[in-house]
Amino acid sequence: METSEDKGFCCYNYIRLKLEAIVPKDDHINALYEALKLRKHAISHINLPSFEDHQEFIKKHPYRSWNFVFAATECIGNFYLQNDNSIGVHLLPGYDHMLPVLLKQILHDYEPLPEIKSKRNAGFVLHVPVGDHERRAQMNANGHTPLQITYTLEKEQV
């Protein structure tokens, strides 16, 4: 994959990645819901939330930064940064190959928040659903090191 950096933009085959901040307006809410319906893997939910629940979530804007990702004029996904220096990336089907370019763009444009021992990593970490074997393989192939696997705990299970 040939990538280059040009004036703060990361490129793939000379197509610039551009980021657009997500705000709680109708077209953003609708686009995010359509993207949510296309996801094969999720961390925060098992069943698709109702549109109303989704809308309320967007209005709360719970992230440090939340952006759509565009290649030329086409939206290829979105990502968020949380205050614990974690990153969530959601690329639309057919755009997984853009992950390394997007991560490079994120690392170029953002600085991690300062480390807090036992609470916040010194650098960014990427959330990957345990069932997303393709994303895990992609991260491993690019030399990234897995840190942990997180389990849910239910009273009935313990």
Give, region by region, the residue ranges found by the protein language model.
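Conserved beta-hairpin
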Residues: 65-77
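Conserved catalytic-core motifs of GNAT/GCN5-like acyltransferases
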Residues: 145-158
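A short helix-loop-beta-strand connector motif used in the catalytic cores of GNAT acetyltransferases and
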Residues: 56-68
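Conserved acetyl-CoA binding element of GNAT-fold acetyltransferases
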Residues: 82-100, 127
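Conserved N-terminal entry element of GNAT/NAT acetyltransferase domains
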Residues: 1-26, 158
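Conserved GNAT-fold acetyl-CoA-binding loop/helix
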Residues: 40-55
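Conserved acetyl-CoA-binding loop-helix of GNAT-fold acetyltransferases
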Residues: 95-114, 133-137, 141
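Conserved beta-strand-loop-alpha-helix junction that forms the acyl-donor binding cleft
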Residues: 117-136, 153-154
